[in-house]
Structures are given as C-alpha cells and as structure tokens.
Curated annotation (Swiss-Prot):
Main location per the UniProt record: nucleus
Bias (Basic and acidic residues) ranges: 1254-1269
Protein name, UniProt field: Nucleoporin NUP188
Disruption phenotype: Morpholino knockdown of the protein causes abnormal heart and gut looping.
Subcellular location: Nucleus, Nuclear pore complex
Family: Belongs to the Nup188 family.
Gene Ontology CC terms, in alphabetical order: nuclear pore
Origin superkingdom: Eukaryota
Organism: Xenopus tropicalis
Bias (Polar residues): 1506-1528
Assigned keywords, A-Z: mRNA transport, Nuclear pore complex, Nucleus, Protein transport, Translocation, Transport
C-alpha cells in the first residue's frame, strides 16, 4: 500500500485491546507509555474525529506519498462519513491493512477499482470499521473510569494518573459538548453525504448516534461517581435532559424503530442516574445527620435551585421523571424544610404517582441484562443511596406498595459489597426501616422478607442471614374474627392466648410450631379483620420446613399453586445461601432433604409449577457442589432424572430401553410453552454432578441423562419454540458446557466392565450421531455473523452481553471438537464427524474455510486461537488438504495469519498457535506450507534453481523472531521463541530442502539459531519458565539433522564455526553438567517434578546430539579424550541415579533413554574410556536397581542394561577375578534369565498357531529368518541376557564360578526346556542362536561341558532339531536368494541354528571325548541324512550358507573320526557312506578351486546374471548388455564373494582330508603286518583329472589334482601380488591373513600326500588287486610324484613356508636353521617323505 509506511498512530480498537490486557503489551510501563501517547485522544473523545475542512482537503491532495486513486477514494469516504479528509485517508489505510478480507497484494488495486471502492461503502464494511473505532475510543475511557480505583487491577496506578490528567483538563465539559452536539446533529441525507447515503445507512447512522449518546452519558455518570458535580453543571445537564425528554424527544425521533428502544431507554436511565449522582445525596445525608446542611453545595446556590424548580416543575408525564422529581423534592426539603414551596411538594406527590420504585427496578434489570460490570454496580450504589435517603425522610405508607420497594432493593443488593454495606449500617436507618417493616409482617406476608434476605446473602453475610432467621422474635398472622380462646385488652390493642396453638395442620410426629399459652400479641385492625403480631420466638428455618411439609400435604388439592407461591421464595433463599456458603448446608438439611419428595410429587400433577420446580433443581445443583454423591443417590430414588430400564450395554447406538423420567414429561411441557427454565436447571445440575467426579458406578447412572442431552437436546434445540430472547443461546451454552466438562474429566482407571463411561459415550455420540453435526453447525456460525452480533449488542463494555454468550458457545464447540478428535479411539474407518469436518463444499463453503476465517475476529483473541488449534488437530489426523478447502481465499487467509503473526501488539498465544499450526502443516499439509513459505524461484545461468523469500513468507517473520538483535524478536517471550524454533525444526525434520537452502544463506542464521546454546541457563525451579529447555532441545536436533543430511564437505562455514566454537568454549562439558543436574533433580524428587516434559525433550535432544557427535567427531570437534570421559561419566552417573529410584515410571523412562546413549558411547569410545572395572561396578548396581522394579515395566530397560554390560566386557579381555562383584553379577543374570525364559516359553506356547508345522521350509538352500515373535527380538532381554552370560562365561577360564551357579540354579534344565520347545515349533530364532552361543562357550571348560552333558543336552536338541530343516509337506525347496541381496552369513537363521548345534556337538566331543561319544553317535545317527545331504550339496549349491554348514559338519566328523572303531561298531553303514561322501566332497572342492571360471559362473547365477545357454570358450566372456556393464563396485563385490567361497572351500578341503586320514592305514603301521580288512579302499585306481560336471568316482587323480591346485595357488600368491586372489586375500581389511592361507594350503598338500601314499601302499599290499594294476599304479604314481617333487623343490627354494604339520611326518626333522638355509628343500619333511615313497615304489 502506498502510504502504509506513514501509519504511526495506533487505532482506537488496538488501544482498547491493549487496555483490556489482550495484547502482548502486559507491562505497566508499556501501558503508561500508551496512555501518555494517546491520552489527548481519550480526553477529546468523539471530538477527535473532526468534520471535513478545505484545508484538510488540500493537505491530502498535496501528499505525494498517496496515489491519486487513494486520494480520490479518501475524499469520497470523507464526504460519506462526514469525517476530516486526512483522517478519512488514514482510516482507509488502517482498514485496508487490518480488516480488508483480501490479499495484501490486491490491496493496491482496491482504490483503482471502482466496483471494489463502492463495495467498501455500500456493504458497510468501511462504515462498520469507522463506527467501531468511535465506540472503541469511548470504551477505552469507560474502562479506565471503571477500574482506576480498583486496587486489584494490574494497571490501576496508570489508569489513575490518566484520569487525573483528564479531570484537570475538564473531561466533563468536553464530553458534555459532544453529547449536546450529538443530540442536535441533523440526520445525513444523500444531498449532504453523497449518493451512498441510503435509508439503511441513515438508520445505521442513527443507531450509532444513540449508542454514542448512551456511552457518553455512561462516562459522565461514572465521572460524577468519582468527582463532585457543581450545581451549575447539574442545571445545564437537567436542561439538556429536559430538552431531549430523557431520551424520549430526540432530534431525529422519526428515525426510531422498535429495535432501537433499548438504546433510547438506556439514554433515559443514565440521564436519571447522572441527576441522582450529581445531587450528591450521600453528602446531603451526612450533613443532615450532623445538622450542617449549609455545607452542601446546593445550600448556597439559591438561584440555581430556583431555576431548577422552574425546569422540573413541568415534568411528570414520563416514568423517567419520577426519581428526578422525588430526589429534588427531598433535597429541597432536607436543605430547608421551612421554605419548601408548594411547587416542591407537588413534585414529590407527582413522583410517588409515577411508581418510581417499579421504574428503578426496571432500570437496574435493564442495565444488568446485557452486562454486569462496574457501571451496573455503581448504578446500584447510586440507587441504594437514593433509597436510603427516601426511606429516611418519608414514611413507608406514603411510598405505596411495599412489594415494589422490596423488588427494587432485591435488584440493588445484587451488586457486590452492598449487602455488606447494609449489614454495617444502623438497623433503624435507610433500608433497615424496610427490613423492620417486612419482619413485622412475617410470616403473614412471607415473600417480601425472603426476597430481601435472598438479596442480602453474600459470602461474608450468609451466616448473618441464617442467624437472623434462626432467632425470629415475632409471628404475625391474620384473623377475620376474634377467636374464642383469646383474652383482649380493653382497647383491643393487645391479645393474650388462653390455649396453645399448633400453627400447621400436619400429622403427628411431623415438625411443627406451637404458640404457647399466655403469649401476648399486638393487634392492628384493618378492613378485613385483625392483624396480630405475637411475641413468640422461633426459628424461621423450622417454619420453612413446615411450609414445605404443608405443600407436600396439599399436592393433589387446589391449594397447591398458592402453596407453591409461598414456598418458592424459601427454596430460592436456601439456594442462595447454599451456593454462597456451603458450610451452612448441613444446617439446612431438613429443608433440602424434602426437595427430592417435592420433585417426585409435583412432577406428576396436572399443571406442574414449572418455575417452582426449576428453583428446586437449582437448589439441588448448588447442594451437589458439596456432596455430589449424596445428591445423586437421593435424586435417583425420585425417578426425576432419565434412567435406563435395562442395564447399560457396552455400545450405545440408540436410546432404546431408556426412560426420560419425571424430567422427560416436564421437558415436553416446556417445549409446548416455549419456556425452558427447568431444562436450564437440569443441565446445570447434571454438569455439577459430572464435575463432582462421582464413582464409576454412580457415573454409569448418569449415562441416560447424558444420552438424553446428546440425542434429544443437542441436535434439536435450535429448532424449538422460544418465547424469550437469548434462551436458545443459553441452552446451547449449557449443553456444550456439560459435554466439555465430561471430556475434561480426569481419566478413570481401566475397569473390567464392558459398560461405557461418560467420556466414551460422548465421543461415540459426537462422532457417529447428529450431535456431532450440531456442534459443527455451531462452529459454522462464522466470523461475519459473530461480528455482526457483537456490533449490535446493547452493552457498552463490549466484554459482556449476547455476543459474548455466542462467542463462548463457539469456543466451547471448538474445544469439544478438538478433544473428541484427540480422545477418540483409533479406527481405519472415517466417522461421520470427521467426514463432515473435512468434506469439500462448493464455493469455499466448507468448515475448514469457516474455521480459518475466524482469524479475522478481533474482539477476543482466544476465539481465533481455538479455531487455529482445531485446524491444527484436523491437519494432524484428517486425510484432507487444508489448502484445497480454503480455495480462492487461501492467499488472503495466509496474509491475515501472517499479519497477526507480525503485529507487535498481537496476543502472544495466537502467535504461538499459528506457529504450532504451521509446524504441523510442514509434515501433513504440503500445499498449505508451500503457500506460507512463499518461496520465489529463479533460474540461474548454470541451469539450477535459486530460491528467495517472498514478501509474504512466514520465514520472514520466523527469522525476525529468532534474531537476538531485533527489538521485536521473540527473545522476550520464551514460549514464542520456542514455537519459532520448533517450526524450523519441523522444516529440517521433514527435509524441506528449498526452505532449508534459503535459510542457510541468510546472514547470521546459524548464529541467531544457536545463540541459546551458548547462554548460561538458570537452574530450573517450579516457578521458572522452562520453554527455553525445549528451545535448546530443538536447536540441538536441527544441528544433528543438518549434519546428518549434509555431506561433511558441504556444511556451511557459518555452522562449522559454530561447532568449533561450541567445542572451544567447552559447551559439551557445560551441557553435560546441566543435563546431569536435571537428571539428578528428577531422581531426588523421585520423578515428581512439574517440568518432566521439558526435561524429557532436552534429554532426548542431548542423546541425539551425543549420538551424532560420536559418528562425526571430527565435524563436531569432539576428539578430546578427557571430554569424552567426562561426557560418558555424566551419562553413566545420570543413568545410575535414575534407575536406582524405586517405584517411579518417570525415572525409569528417562533412565532407559540415557541407557541407550550410554551403549553407543561404550561401543564408539572404548579406547578413551576409563578402566572397565569402574564402569562394570556402576552397571552392576544399575542392574540390581532395575531388577528390584516391577519386571513387566522394565523389560526394555533390562535389555539395555544387559547390552551396556556386554559392551563394557568388550573393552578389554578380563578375567573373572578382575570383574567387580562377578559372582553376584552372574547370579543376577541367571536369575533374570530364569524368569524371562519361563515367560518366553509360556508366551510361545500360547501364540503359535496350530498349523505352524505346515509352513516350515527346507533350509538347505534358503536363509529362512523365521517369524520373529514379539518377545523374541534381537535386542530382547532373553537374547541379550544369554549373550551377557556368554561374555561372563568367557571370563571364567576355569569354570569354577559358573559351576557354583549351575549347581545353585536350574539354569541348564530351564534353557534346555526352552530350546526344545522353540526347536520343535521352529520359533524364537534369536533366542535359540543365543542359547547355542552361550552353551558353546560354556563347553570350553571340562566342568561346563560335563554339566551340559549331565543335564541332557543331546536329548534336548537331537530330535527337535529335525524340525529346523525338514521339508514341508509338498517336498519342494526354494531357490537360493542372490548372494549380494541376502543378509550376512552371521545374521540369525534356522540353518545357522543347525550349524551352531553341530559345532556344539563337536566342542562337547572334543572336550569330553569318550564321556560324550555315545551322545555324539546318537546325534550322527539321527541326522545322518542331513549330514550326507550336506556333504553332497557342495557340488550343486556352492553358496556361503551351504559351505558354512559343510565346514561345521566336516569339523564334527573330524572329531568323531578319532573314534572309528566305536563308530564302525554302532553305525557301520553310515561310516561307509560318510567315507564315500567325503571323497566326493574332496573331489568337488578341488574341481571348484581348480576352475575359477566355473566358480564365478555359479556365483553369477546366484546373483541373477544372465549367462549363455551354451558353453563359452575359457578365454571369452558372454557379452553383456549396456545396462549390465560391470562397474568398479560390482567387480570389487565379485572379488569379495570369490574370496569368501574359495576360503570356505579350502577349509572344508583341509578338514575333509584330515578326516579321511582316520579311515586310511597309518604310515608307520602299514609297512608292518596289518589287518587290511578294517580299512576300505577310498580312492579308485585312476590318475585322470576328473571333470567337474561328470559323476566320476574319486581316484588318485583327485588327490594329485588337489596337490596341483594347492601348489598352483601357492605359486600364484607368491608370484602375482596383482592376481585377483592375491589382491583379495592380501587386503589389509581382510579377515583372512596371507600367512594363514599358505599354511592351510600346505596342510591340504600334506594330507593329500599322506592319503596318496597310504592308499597306494594299501593297494600294493592288497592281494585282491591284480599285479598288472599294481605295476601300472607304480609307474603312474612315480611319474606324477616326481613331477610334483620338482615343483615342490622349486617352491621351497623360493622361500616357501615349512609344513605346519611337519612334526607329524615320519621323515626326520631338520637339525638346525643353518642347514635349512643351505638346502632348504632337502630338509623339508614333506619332500623327504615323498622321496622315500618314490624310492619304495620304484623298487
């Protein structure tokens, strides 16, 4: 906008908002500055708005900052409004800036667009804005006058100085002139104000003028209440009031419409009040009591008094004149009774005839109907003073009806403090006279006294009222004729009773009153008989009880209506007493206990007394605030409330079986009559009972009541008939208040019953029935309708009235909907409520748009805040686009949101809620957040896109909020700062790259963002603002996300400097200390802090910060070992402090969080941490503390502590004696395992379906990970406990400690039982693997192995292990998955379980030998098919899994081969099959090692690569498509796979050959006499190298080929370091060392030679072999071995390593190192052996 920058003056509405405390300006100094700056405007009042002038027109036209179109529109507006041209332009600018409903971009075009310009005036939007500005200005003055003397108001001192200034500068004179001007102003016409001034506009102008007149008079009245008025001022006012007829003879009265009557009446009322207040009656009464009337101002103003007489003498034809005439007449009489003229006497009599007390009652009722504020209280005080003056100076009989006086007093005493003022006065003066009068007529006239006392009850006077009525000293009754049992005085002025009299004709035993014999009574005769006042003392409360009893007696007679009229004031009084002072409730029990019977009986009469019943229900509602349970129980027996005929079901869909009770019949009558007093009382009662937090059983009884409200009232109340204005709004408010109270009940404990509680009933009904639509309709009223109602309400304060009631109802609807969405159970189906909330309407007519437009509401900031809160909730949970719902209004609404966010006086809570809404929108509303981000895109020369912030981008505001140097930043408002940082965190968390890129480039962004991290935080207390902790937490998370997203080299220099500064200024240490202190505070308070949310946020962020720092130590400069030790020490100490606190879920949760980061630090910083002994000691204490808690709550925590212990044990190898409290730690771990394993087994048995067995698959070719059950997790307690037990077991080298534990606890039987169950049903994979790892470690010691064997390990696993690998029922097996895609070989799998079991058998056999031989043979016998299948599968499935199983299997067979005789005895056929399969296995391994191309072929097939169907030449590769061209990464992966497979084949080959040695004769024995039958011929007599794909019997050629392969590999490793195998095996990162590989190759070679020689000698000594074959064997073998010997000699001459098994060879050992150096090949035992054999063969 062109001149937006010129706006510097605050609008009157803004000023009013500031004074109300609804802005961000809360400090008294700020309020004082505003009042100083705009005090002159307040003093001028409406005169601030000047009329048009020629000079002003010239200034506007000369202003170069204004566009011509804006000047023109401003001048037209000036003529239309009759306002100064400059002010008109300024008004137009502020309207376009604050209230225009379009985008700020479109504002520029409004003045140029004729259609839009006309719309501003024709649609009255500009007019409304101007009128509101005028009213707001007067409201500011009113507000200041109301509260400048109120010490409780926070700005009373500032207001007082402002009032002092205005009083000095003659506020009254200025405002009186304004009032005169308004009274005499001519109505505008189209000639004077332009063509836009239509009749409707004139009518609106007149309404505005009436409202302004009323407010000016109200200001003058309040001014006179504080400052004395001079007689001349009163005279001038009186003349003016007479001129305009106290509002009845207005200048433009032809414009008055019926709707304006309340304003006209209000003008008259304030005119009268000003007159009464200006008379200063209180001073007059004080002067009269002291006989110093000459001190009154009017006593010396005789001329003014005469003029006043002449002015007032003509009055008397209107009700407004009554109080004026009477007050003036009494003043004249009090000042000088002797000089009272007949004119004055005539005024008095005229006033009495005008029914002044009825008028005063109507006046106070009218003032209080719209609002109940300071003005009303001041008016009541003024009338109270007037009544006191009248009653003091006039006889009561002169004042006509006593009832009118009582009615007026009832209204007067409704003001606070006036009842106390009355009780502190003399009882014989003023209204005390009235009290004495009504007491004299009690109980003949029952109502006046009760009504008066009902008004006199206050918090401080309730007990006085009770005591007064409890000690009544007279009883007045009426007699038509003189009774026969009376003795009378001669003049019949005194009577005396000769007999006692029972006052109430009640039954025997009932409460009653009895006038005793001899009682004296004063007689007052009247035209209807005798009125006798007996001198009889009694309690009125007893009398009231008798009256209620009498009503119960006459319920079914014609007297019931009359008796109800007598009893209703009693009930009203009791209600007021109980609601004011609950401590008196017990004393009133005889009365309140009878109300239930009244309800029960009167509900069923023909024409129930509705008002009376309403009072009864109200009384019970007041009583329920103190004793809700008792009221509910007693009320339930009456049948008044709705009830369920049948027990309440779990899901209430309809009201079937519900009875509306007595209230239901009354409800029908009320609907037909259009009056709803009982319904309102019913709602108040039920709300009170709900808030009373009844027990669950009693709350169930309220379900029918709530259901009645939800099904019958809420959906239909807006369609009912109403006789009175405003009742519908009250009903809606009460219904929603009840629902709101239910939804805000504290959650009850879970119960086993299926009956619904009140909350679930409300949630179900609102989400699935018409009740929810009714709430939506209330929210859908819209901001325009609400603003219109606010503008038309008659009250002057703007804070009370009909508009306020509607606003509160809408706010309740917002809160209810928000709570329903928050509390409703999760469901995949969309409920009708959610559908209605999110459905798209035509032309933007949908609820989302309506909610968003509440941002335009300016009166109460809590309304738009609640609307935005609901929008936020919907954006979180509803599957819809808010942006789409807003339609074409989206940009305008965005600008409105950002305008309020930018406004420096805007309420802080709205700003916070807007930011929270945007924070949610980042994740859930992509379209909307892009609209708010408003990023502008530019294409750079490089072809990339460059982003910048648009003018209306929310990031502009956020950057300003976090800028510590900006005076308007949020640094003074911690909650707002936190919300801004939270929004930025959402951008990083959702990875909004464009926004992040723009923010990174902003200067000082990282400095401003991270500033809080470098400050010094005060230690938090209960009263401190803790949002700074959340702010710091979000900042830490943003830094973590930035480091995580960005490549190290791409971090901005600014952030790098910040991180370096963070390290250099020792902020790691500072924050570690701070977080540690918070943790210790929580631990000391046992989790009872009020700030746990903030603490948890900071702790979570610090945890993330440390995790990122451990992985990016160089980036975050966390490399100092001392700092690392300090951080870990604090984390460990905090964890220990929290987890040692008993019975605190909070401490447990926080401790578990810290435990996670402790595990990471342990693993990442092993080398920097202190001795593990101290860490283990603390962890042991933590574990003991955790084990003392409820085990169902600490499962995850136990797992984390176990993981920490495992990591601590891995810091360095330790012996059991070095581990602190080792025995106790082992015992704790085993006891925990015992409990957890039992639970796991029970859980497994319950959860496993019956058909699990049919789903098992063959695991030979698959890595079946199984289905991980909920309790069988990799990081579960059982699994980690077993791994910890394994680590502890490794530390106990001797096994003594574990032996003791195994004797003390049944650990092994329990583990074996769990393992057996898990294996049988093939569940708990991780658990099974962990057990086997633990058992494998335990079996290293002889004691552990013996214990396992004794506990029956073989019986446990032998048969159940079959289910791990058996085929499914269809017998099919699945293909091996791609090697590069499947998990690591170490990942948990069922084949892995089988492999571990085989290894365990091997370890046990190795440790126990003959003691375990029988079990080992049993195991082999059971699994022989699997063993043989595994040995043969290497040829067809050369995958790592298959090779690994073959490796374990051959290893086990190697150990078992030490017992060949026993094996042959028990399993003769199996041993033969094993021998054959081992030979074939040897041949398969040799072939695969020999043909690397074939091995790669297999690997490529496993990886899914396409191969040619025909065999390709050895030197060629199959052409690949361009998409499959090999890359460096794929080649490296292929080499690693090749290395792994070759290494596995070599290990298998070595173990296979070593095992076969047990089945061939020993070289030392074979030359001696030997039984050859016990050794089978293993290899065929053939020397041909076998082909891989041919099923050829293993032969000598196989062994020779093996030697050739090993020799070739050794040569390649030495010659070609760049050979693929050499490269792979020689990598520094490889797990296989080059030296070990060479040793393994030599070991294979030795065993080949050994087998070759042994089998050759076996052939030579076998008589069954033909001599010709023996000779051929000698020749072939001699030739082959000679060739191999020469190759071996060359290898050893090059420096090859000696045989690893040289000591086992029969050839002599080398004698010294020097000999070996001279002729190394001659000294090699292997060569010597082969040479000896060659010589033997050649002989």
């Amino acid at each position: 906008m062109a001149a937006a920058g010129c706006l510097y003056r605050r609008t009157s509405r803004e000023l009013w908002t500031i004074l109300l405390g609804r802005s961000s300006m809360k400090d008294g100094h700020q309020i004082k500055a505003e009042l100083d700056r705009y005090g002159d405007r307040l003093l001028q009042g409406l005169a601030y708005y000047r009329p048009p002038s020629t000079s002003s027109t010239g200034k506007v036209k000369a202003n170069k900052n204004l566009s011509p179109a804006l000047q023109e529109l401003g001048l037209r507006l000036s003529k239309f409004l009759g306002l100064d041209e400059e002010q008109s332009v300024e008004l137009l600018q502020t309207y376009l800036l604050y209230d225009y409903r379009g985008t700020q971009e479109s504002v520029k075009g409004v003045p140029q667009d004729e259609r839009q310009s006309q719309a501003l005036m024709l649609k009255a939007s500009m007019v409304d804005y101007y009128y509101e500005e005028r009213i707001s200005l007067l409201r500011c003055v009113l507000y200041i006058l109301n509260y400048f003397q109120d010490d409780k108001h926070p700005y009373s001192a500032e207001f007082s100085k402002c009032v002092e200034m205005m009083e000095q500068k003659e506020l009254f004179g200025k405002y009186l002139k304004q009032f005169e001007s308004l009274c005499r102003e001519e109505a505008p016409t189209w000639e004077t104000h332009g063509n836009f001034m239509t009749e409707r506009q004139v009518s609106r102008w007149f309404v505005q003028r009436l409202r302004e007149q009323a407010m000016l008079l109200e200001i003058i009245f309040l001014y006179f209440a504080c400052f004395a008025a001079s007689p001349s001022d009163l005279l001038a006012l009186t003349k003016l009031f007479k001129e305009q007829g106290f509002g009845c003879r207005l200048q433009n009265r032809h414009l008055v419409e019926p709707s304006m009557d309340p304003l006209v009446e209000r003008i008259g009322y304030f005119s009268v009040l000003i007159f009464l207040e200006a008379l200063d009656i209180e001073t007059l009464m004080t002067c009269s009591l002291s006989d110093k009337t000459e001190q009154h101002p009017f006593s010396s103003e005789e001329q003014v008094c005469k003029e006043m007489d002449s002015v007032l003498v003509t009055l008397g034809d209107a009700p407004h004149h009554g109080p004026v005439l009477l007050a003036w007449a009494l003043l004249r009489f009090a000042l000088n009774a002797d000089k009272v003229t007949p004119t004055v006497r005539k005024m008095g009599s005229t006033a009495i005839q005008l029914h002044i007390f009825q008028y005063l009652t109507r006046m106070l009722q009218s003032l209080r109907s719209g609002e109940n504020n300071c003005t009303t209280s001041t008016a009541c005080l003024c009338v109270y003073t007037f009544l006191t003056f009248v009653l003091t100076n006039l006889e009561e009989q002169v004042l006509q009806s006593q009832q009118d006086l009582v009615d007026t007093a009832f209204q007067v005493f409704a003001a606070p403090n006036l009842p106390d003022l009355f009780w502190n006065m003399e009882p014989t003066a003023g209204l005390g006279i009235l009290l004495d009068s009504v007491v004299g007529m009690f109980p003949f006239h029952l109502s006046p006294l009760l009504k008066l006392f009902t008004a006199l009850v206050s918090k401080s006077s309730a007990k006085k009222v009770y005591s007064f009525l409890d000690r009544m000293s007279s009883y007045t009754e009426h007699y038509r004729h003189k009774p026969h049992d009376i003795l009378s005085h001669e003049d019949e002025t005194l009577w005396k009773r000769q007999t006692p009299k029972v006052l109430y004709a009640l039954g025997l035993g009932q409460t009653n009153l009895r006038i005793p014999q001899g009682t004296i009574g004063q007689v007052m005769a009247d035209e209807h008989g005798f009125l006798v006042r007996w001198e009889y003392s009694y309690s009125c409360w007893t009398l009231f009880t008798c009256e209620i009893e009498m009503l119960l007696h006459v319920v079914s007679t014609a007297d019931v209506i009359h008796q109800c009229q007598r009893v209703k004031p009693i009930i009203d009084l009791v209600h007021k007493v109980i609601s004011t002072d609950l401590s008196i409730a017990d004393c009133l029990l005889p009365i309140t206990s009878r109300i239930y019977m009244l309800l029960q009986r009167l509900t069923t009469v023909m024409n129930p007394p509705m008002d009376f019943l309403s009072s009864c229900v109200d009384c019970l509602a007041a009583l329920a605030t103190r004793m809700p349970a008792k009221v509910w129980i007693d009320l339930r027996h009456t049948g008044f409330l709705p009830f369920a005929a049948n027990p309440v079901s779990g899901h209430i869909i309809s009201t079937e079986g519900m009875n509306a009770g007595g209230y239901g019949s009354l409800f029908g009558i009320e609907q037909s009559q259009g009056e709803y007093s009982i319904t309102l009382s019913f709602l108040r009662l039920v709300t009170t009972l709900v808030k009373g937090q009844l027990g669950s059983t009693q709350s169930q009884g309220l379900v029918p009541c709530i259901l009645f409200v939800l099904r019958e009232m809420l959906p239909n109340y807006h369609r009912w008939r109403y006789n009175s204005h405003g009742v519908r709004e009250q009903l809606g408010f009460q219904i929603l208040s009840l629902i709101h109270a239910i939804l805000n009940l504290s959650p009850e404990e879970e119960e086993s019953t299926s009956t619904p509680n009140l909350q679930s009933l409300c949630i179900f009904s609102l989400t699935n029935t018409e009740a929810g639509q009714a709430v939506i309709n209330i929210m859908g009223v819209g901001v325009d309708t609400l603003n219109a109602v606010m503008l038309t309400q008659a009250g002057s304060s703007g804070t009370e009235g009909q508009g306020q009631m509607l606003m509160q109802t809408i706010k309740l609807a917002f809160s209810i909907t928000n709570n329903v969405i928050r509390l409703k159970p999760l469901s995949s189906a969309i409920s009708p409520l959610e559908h209605a909330l999110t459905q798209h309407g035509a032309h933007g007519n949908n609820l989302i748009a309506v909610l968003a437009k509440y941002i335009y509401h300016k009166y109460d900031p809590s309304l738009p805040r609640l609307a935005i809160q609901l929008l936020k909730r919907l954006a979180m949970v509803a599957p819809m686009s808010v942006y789409a719902c807003l339609g074409s209004d989206a940009a305008a609404i965005r600008d409105a949101f950002l305008s309020r966010l930018r406004d420096n006086i805007e309420d802080m809570q709205i700003k916070i809620m807007i930011l929270e809404f945007l924070t949610v929108a980042v994740e859930t509303q992509p379209g909307l957040i892009e609209l708010f981000l408003n990023l502008e895109v530019k294409d750079t020369n490089e072809g990339s896109k460059e982003y910048s912030l648009g003018e209306w981008s929310c990031l502009q505001v956020v950057l300003k909020l976090i800028d510590s140097q900006d005076p308007e930043s949020s640094w003074g408002a911690p909650l707002l700062h936190r919300s801004a940082i939270a929004f930025l965190h959402a951008l990083w968390q959702d990875r909004r790259d464009s926004a992040m890129t723009v923010l990174r480039t902003k200067p000082n962004f990282w400095e401003n963002l991270t500033s809080p991290l470098f400050g010094t935080l005060a230690f938090p207390s209960e009263s401190s603002e803790l949002s700074i902790l959340e702010t710091c937490a979000f900042i830490m998370k943003i830094i973590c996300l930035e480091i995580y997203y960005a490549v190290r080299g791409s971090l901005g220099d600014s952030l790098k400097k910040i991180l370096k500064k963070f390290s250099e200024e020792e902020r790691f240490t500072y924050w570690s200390n701070y977080v540690h202190s918070l943790v210790c505070q929580v631990a000391e308070s046992e989790g009872a802090c009020n700030s746990l949310t903030e603490y948890q946020q900071l702790l979570s962020a610090w945890r993330m910060f440390l995790m990122v720092a451990t992985h990016n130590a160089d980036v975050m400069h966390l490399t100092n070992p001392e700092v690392r030790q300090k951080l870990f020490k604090d984390v460990l100490g905090g964890t220990q402090a929290l987890l040692l606190v008993p019975r605190s879920m909070t401490c447990l949760h926080l401790g578990s969080m810290l435990c996670t980061v402790m595990i990471i630090l342990l693993r990442r910083w092993k080398s920097d941490l202190a001795a593990p002994e101290d860490i283990l000691s603390s962890l042991t204490q933590i574990l003991e503390g955790v084990l003392q808690k409820d085990q169902q709550l600490v499962e995850k925590t136990k797992a984390r502590v176990f993981a920490a212990l495992i990591s601590a044990l891995e810091i360095k190898p330790m012996k059991a004696s070095e581990i602190p409290q080792y025995p106790q730690l082992v015992l704790n771990v085993c006891e925990t395992l015992q409990e957890e394993v039992v639970f796991l087994v029970d859980h497994t048995r319950q959860e496993v379906p019956a058909n699990d067995a049919s789903e098992d698959k063959d695991s030979m070719e698959t890595e079946d990970t199984g289905r991980i059950r909920q309790k069988d997790q990799r990081d579960g307690v059982c699994v980690l406990g077993l791994h910890l037990a394994k680590g502890l077991c490794e530390a106990d080298e001797e096994g003594d400690q574990w032996q003791q534990v195994l004797r003390k606890l049944p650990v092994l039987p329990m583990l074996f039982s769990a393992l057996e169950v898990s294996l049988r049903i093939k569940q708990n994979l991780h658990f099974c693997e962990a057990i086997l790892h633990f058992l494998f470690t335990l079996a290293k010691t002889h004691q552990g192995a013996a214990a396992m064997a004794g506990a029956g390990v073989t019986q446990t696993v032998c048969l159940p292990l079959l289910s791990v690998y058996q085929l499914s029922s269809n017998g099919a097996s699945t293909a091996q998955p791609a090697l590069s895609l499947r998990k690591s070989l170490d990942a948990p799998s069922w084949p892995g379980v089988y492999r571990l079991t085989v290894s365990l058998m091997e370890r046990l056999l190795k440790t126990l030998r003959y003691n375990f031989l029988t079990e080992a043979l049993d195991f082999v016998g059971v699994h022989q098919e699997r063993i043989l299948q595994c040995l043969g599968a290497v040829r067809t499935v050369p995958s790592l899994a298959c090779l690994e199983e073959a490796d374990h299997t051959v290893g086990f067979l190697l150990q078992l081969s030490n017992f060949t005789k026993e094996w042959h005895f028990h399993l003769p056929q199996l041993i033969k099959d094993v021998q054959v399969n081992l030979c074939y296995l040897c041949q398969a391994c040799t072939s695969l090692l020999h043909s690397r191309k074939m091995l790669q072929h297999y690997l490529q097939i496993k990886n899914g690569e396409t191969m040619s169907s025909t065999a390709t030449p050895r030197g060629q590769r199959t052409p690949q498509t361009p998409s499959k061209q090999p890359t460096a990464e794929s080649e490296a992966l292929e080499l690693r796979q090749l290395r792994s497979v070759q290494h596995s084949l070599l290990k298998i080959l070595g173990k296979t050959l070593a095992t076969l040695r047990a089945f061939t004769p020993d070289l030392c024995q074979i030359l001696q006499p030997l039984d050859l039958a016990q050794y089978n011929l293993l290899f065929a007599l053939s020397f041909t190298t076998p082909a891989f794909d041919a099923d050829v019997t293993p032969s000598f050629g196989t062994l020779l080929a093996t030697v050739n392969v090993t020799l070739s590999m050794l040569g390649e490793m030495d010659k070609k370091k760049d050979h693929p195998l050499g490269q792979v095996l020689g990598e520094t990162n490889s797990t296989v060392d080059n030296k070990n590989i060479k040793s393994l190759l030599l070991f294979i070679m030795e065993n080949c030679f050994y087998l070759l020689i042994s089998q050759a000698v076996r052939y030579l000594r076998d008589p069954s072999v033909h001599p010709r074959d023996k000779q051929r064997m000698k020749q072939e073998l001699s030739s082959e071995l000679s060739t191999l010997l020469s190759s071996l000699s060359r290898y050893f001459r090059r420096g090859g390593p000696s045989s690893p098994a040289g000591g086992l060879m029969p050839s002599p050992q080398p004698k010294g190192a020097s000999a070996a150096k001279v002729v190394p090949e001659a000294q090699e035992p292997l060569i010597q052996l082969v040479q000896a054999f060659v010589r033997h063969v050649q002989r």
